[in-house]
Amino acid sequence: MPALLVESLMRVRHPAMVPITDIATRETPLRVALRSWFVVVGFWWSATGAIFALERSAATRTLGLVLASALALWGGALVVLERDRDTPSGARRAFLGAAFLWSWVQVAFYGAWIVGPEARMVPVPAEAPGWGLAVRAVASMLWYQLTMLAVMGWAWRVTTARVNRMAWWTLTLFWLVHQVASVNIFLGVENPGRGFFPEPLAYLESYFGPVRNSWLLPASIAVLLTWTIGAVVQALRGPTPYRRQAMMLLSVIGVLSVAELAILGAPLTVPLWEAFLAIRGY
């Protein structure tokens, strides 16, 4: 991961100093899979943990926003720089750029910088999930939802008709699985993860559904699992090294998404970010 970050930074600041080379003949399915797993899981675990830890105080939230904004600018530059490079490394760097942009949105949300209309950021009385409650839930974090769509729209615009659309695919998949998880929590799951929201966002727990799994959870897992298997097949049989690398990265996101939904449906605690939560004082 550090080597990938350093090379990506060199490409942004001094593109002429970094030769455009991809030794496709040395790529094997196992190597592509391991590299993809390392990049996606490493970023997912460390970025999520950092977001939790930075909610410790107003000062750390501000620091988190500054750092995330700087990385988002770098991420945007990577998306633009790599959009004409249909190589495995181009796919990885475009993924990294999209991940930085997505992380900026999440940091802004969890730091309560971009959430929704202030009048809506209050707990609501308990009631069964329904359309009215769903509309209020979306309205309570409207700016956050619109910001995600705006970032996706920008990625779509700058990668349209380009050979490397990995950033757009990544952001779209992030958004889709995020919405699927949110709707499942709204309808009800065994393990919604109460207590993870920082104090300014604690009101969102009033929109959590009953502590039981709804019909949507197994259906969501089945659909995501089917898509992930298809993505793995494309990653193994893709016509080009770029396509194989891109689909392998997306398939790892799919695997993590299936695992996340399974954890939501299981009455257990998985200590993935205990150290980060301890820093926050959770």
Give short role names for the model-derived ranges:
Residues 126-141, 202-215:
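Short aromatic-rich membrane-water interface segments that cap or initiate transmembrane helices
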Residues 49-62, 80-85:
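Short, hydrophobic transmembrane alpha-helix segments
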Residues 91-95, 160-174, 243-255:
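Interfacial segments of alpha-helical transmembrane regions
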